[in-house]
């Protein structure tokens, strides 16, 4: 028969396991969910939702489809309908990009009523990255230079895509489940936007990412975790600051700074085509005229 000390030890182990399970069940990924009662018209969304994209996906798209530069953004666990996410998308699109935000989660977004572990098993970002290949292939077939970015859950998807030849640049914002080992396989320039008080991917883990990338030499990278940046995991896309009274002015500034950071990342590393599809017909005609004049003047010089 077990002694009282053994019983107490066993009970302590059970309580510790229960506490660990509870801690694991809660994640910063679930903090500050977006207000889904806010509609696109209230935010003056510039884009639209399209259906039947390659891979059977629907998506929020913004920007000129004729642009030679495309960005695929992967949402966090709350999905592609988050109001602030769409505002960020519109800002990036305004900078000259065609931006696609697929509904990788297919309407099954995470909330506090669902088991986090079970939900993740049903929504593997690694599998989602594989399923997205037809979309990336279609964008490349159109002659576009393609980049990928992601938030939280979407950060893991993005880093998986960054291991392939499907894109030319990667941007991670407070990623979830990304490891230093992932950095050993990334093939393209990568930007890592961390949060100061992120327990999901804390600054120390981001430093490990940087260490691996620095040792590799061949992959350009940047890390941003400035003091004026986001302080919490998911802070950038899980709220709608201009409509949420509880949201502070610094958060509004963070969203603006973040849009600029994402644009800066892609402007730095995503190649521009010489003849951009957005070039005006007048510019093209003028260019052809001057090239022709140069050619004929060169020809007549030898006649």
Curated annotation (Swiss-Prot):
One of its GO terms (cellular component) is extracellular region. Glycosylated. Transmembrane segments: none annotated. Residues 1-43 form the signal peptide. Keywords: Glycoprotein, Hydrolase, Secreted, Signal. Gene3D superfamilies: alpha/beta hydrolase. The keyword Endoplasmic reticulum does not apply. InterPro entries: AB_hydrolase_fold, Dienelactn_hydro. It is an enzyme of class 3 (hydrolase). The keyword NADP does not apply. Glycans are attached at residues 115, 197, 257. It is found in: Secreted. Its EC number is 3.2.1.-. GO terms for molecular function: hydrolase activity. Its main location: secreted. Plays a role in control of plant growth. Mediates specific degradation of cell wall (1,3)(1,4)-beta-D-glucans and is related to auxin-mediated growth and development of cereal coleoptiles. This is Endo-1,3;1,4-beta-D-glucanase.
């Amino acid at each position: 028969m077990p002694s009282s000390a053994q019983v107490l030890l066993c009970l302590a182990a059970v309580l510790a396991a229960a506490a660990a399970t509870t801690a694991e069940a809660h994640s910063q990924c679930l903090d500050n969910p977006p207000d889904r009662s806010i509609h696109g018209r209230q935010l003056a969304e510039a884009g639209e939702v399209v259906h039947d994209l390659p891979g059977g996906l629907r998506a929020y798209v913004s920007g000129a489809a004729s642009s030679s530069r495309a960005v695929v953004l992967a949402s966090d666990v709350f999905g592609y309908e988050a109001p602030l996410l769409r505002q960020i998308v519109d800002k990036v699109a305004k900078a000259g990009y065609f931006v696609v935000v697929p509904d990788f989660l297919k309407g099954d977004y995470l909330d506090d009523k669902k088991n986090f572990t079970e939900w993740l098993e049903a929504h593997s970002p690694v599998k989602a990255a594989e399923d997205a290949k037809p979309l990336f292939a279609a964008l490349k077939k159109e002659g576009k230079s393609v980049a990928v970015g992601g938030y939280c859950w979407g950060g893991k998807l993005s880093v998986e895509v960054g291991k392939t030849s499907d894109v030319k640049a990667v941007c991670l914002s407070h990623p979830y489940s990304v490891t230093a080992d992932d950095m050993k396989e990334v093939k393209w320039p990568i930007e890592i936007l961390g949060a100061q008080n992120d327990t999901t991917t804390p600054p120390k883990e981001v430093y490990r990412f940087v260490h691996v990338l620095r040792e590799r030499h061949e992959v350009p990278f940047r890390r941003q975790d400035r003091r004026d940046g986001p302080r919490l995991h998911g802070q950038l896309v899980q709220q709608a600051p201009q409509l949420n009274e509880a949201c502070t002015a610094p958060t509004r500034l963070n969203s603006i700074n973040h849009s600029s950071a994402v644009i800066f990342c892609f402007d730095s590393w995503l190649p521009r085509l010489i003849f951009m599809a957005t070039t005006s017909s007048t510019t093209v005609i003028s260019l052809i005229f001057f090239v022709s004049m140069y050619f004929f003047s060169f020809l007549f010089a030898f006649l």
